[in-house]
Amino acid sequence: MTQTPIRLLIAASGTGGHLFPALAVAEQLLDYKIEWLGVPNRLEQTLVPQDYPLHTIAVEGFQTGFSLKSVKILLGLFSSVFQVRKLLRERKIDIVFTTGGYIASPAILAARLEGIPVILHESNYLPGKVTRFFSRWCQTVALGFEGSSQYFPNVETVWVSTPVRAQFLTPQPLDLPLEEDAFLIVVVGGSQGAVAVNQLVRQCALKWLEKGAYIVHLTGDRDPEADSFKHPHYFSLPFYENMAGLLQRANLAISRAGAGTLTELAITQTPAILIPYPYAAEDHQTYNGKVFADAGAAYLYSQKDLTPQLLEKVVLDLLNSPAKLQEMAEKTGKLAVADSAKRLADLVRNHTLLAEVSQK
C-alpha cells in the first residue's frame, strides 16, 4: 500500500532573503508534496521550480496609524486569509512553513483557523513586525541568529541559522576569465541591487584595479549607470547565477547586510565590508551586520558615513594585509552552520509527526 505523501505549503515571497532559505528547506524534503504560496509579479515567479505548484494572492504590508489605506489593507488581509483557508482545504495541506514577510500573515492566520501547524523562520537578528506579532500562533519560530530569542519571550524558539542552497556546500566551477591567483573583490547589493553602493565602488575601483585586483560587480537591474565604468579586469553584471562559485573564489566582498547574504558569506568564509541598507525596516540590516563585525568577520560602515576615500583606503589596506584577511575568513567561517537546511527540515518533520499523533 502506497503511503500518501505529506503535503507542505511554503509561504515565501518577494526577495532572495525570503526565497532562498525556503528553497533550501524544500531541497531537504524530497518525500513531501510541496506547494508554494507567493504574491503576483514577484521574484518567486522565476525562482520557484515548476515542481512546486505556485499559488499567488495579493497582500500588502501593514500601515501604522488609522487611514483609508490601512483599512483597505486590513480588508485585503481578511480576503487573503479566506483565500488561503480555501487553498489549505482544497490541497489537503498538512503543515505550513513560512520565512516571514507580508505573505506570512495570511498563511499563519489561515493555518491557525484550520488547525494546521506552522513553522516560521526569521532570518534577521531583529525580527520583523509580522514575525513578532504573528509568532504567537506558530508552533515554533526558528531563528537565524541565536541572540534573537530575546524578542520572543513567550514563544518556543530554536536556533538553526539560515539555510543556504545546496550548491554552496560543495566547490563550484567559475566561468569568468580570472587569473588563477588574482585578488578578487565581489560587490553584491542583494537580490535587488544597491545603486548607492554601486556608485561608491565605481569611484574607488580604478585604484584597486591598479593594484592587481579583479572586480566582479553585481549591480542589479535598476542602476542606470551600470555600464559607465570599463576595465579589462572589471566585470559589471546585473546578476550572476553561480553565487556559490563566485563567493568561494572571492578574497573580499563588499555587500549589504541582508541575512541571506551574510549566511552565504559565512558558509564560503568570505571576509566582507558591510554597508547596511539604510532604509531597511527598523534598520534590521545594521543589527545583522553588527553580529559579524563584533565577531571580527567583517567591517561595518553606515552608508552615510562611508566616503569613497574611506572605502578606497580600507580595501587597499586589506589588499596589502593577507594575514588580516585570513583571520577575518576564519572568524567568518565560525559563524557558519552548514546543516541549517537539514535542521529546519527536521523541525518540519517533527511537527508533522506531532500533528499526526494528536489527530489519532
Curated annotation (Swiss-Prot):
Enzyme class: transferase
MF terms (GO), sorted A to Z: UDP-N-acetyl-D-glucosamine:N-acetylmuramoyl-L-alanyl-D-glutamyl-meso-2,6-diaminopimelyl-D-alanyl-D-alanine-diphosphoundecaprenol 4-beta-N-acetylglucosaminlytransferase activity; undecaprenyldiphospho-muramoylpentapeptide beta-N-acetylglucosaminyltransferase activity
Pathway(s) the chain acts in: Cell wall biogenesis; peptidoglycan biosynthesis
The name this protein goes by in its record: UDP-N-acetylglucosamine--N-acetylmuramyl-(pentapeptide) pyrophosphoryl-undecaprenol N-acetylglucosamine transferase
Parts forming coiled coils: none
Entry GO CC: plasma membrane
Entry's EC annotation: 2.4.1.227
Subcellular location: Cell inner membrane
Reaction equations catalysed: di-trans,octa-cis-undecaprenyl diphospho-N-acetyl-alpha-D-muramoyl-L-alanyl-D-glutamyl-meso-2,6-diaminopimeloyl-D-alanyl-D-alanine + UDP-N-acetyl-alpha-D-glucosamine = di-trans,octa-cis-undecaprenyl diphospho-[N-acetyl-alpha-D-glucosaminyl-(1->4)]-N-acetyl-alpha-D-muramoyl-L-alanyl-D-glutamyl-meso-2,6-diaminopimeloyl-D-alanyl-D-alanine + UDP + H(+)
Keywords on record: Cell cycle, Cell division, Cell inner membrane, Cell membrane, Cell shape, Cell wall biogenesis/degradation, Glycosyltransferase, Membrane, Peptidoglycan synthesis, Transferase
Recorded family membership: Belongs to the glycosyltransferase 28 family. MurG subfamily.
Domain of life: Bacteria
Positions bound to UDP-N-acetyl-alpha-D-glucosamine: 15-17, 124, 165, 191, 285
Function: Cell wall formation. Catalyzes the transfer of a GlcNAc subunit on undecaprenyl-pyrophosphoryl-MurNAc-pentapeptide (lipid intermediate I) to form undecaprenyl-pyrophosphoryl-MurNAc-(pentapeptide)GlcNAc (lipid intermediate II).
Membrane topology (UniProt): Peripheral membrane protein
Gene Ontology biological process: carbohydrate metabolic process; cell division; cell wall organization; lipid glycosylation; peptidoglycan biosynthetic process; regulation of cell shape
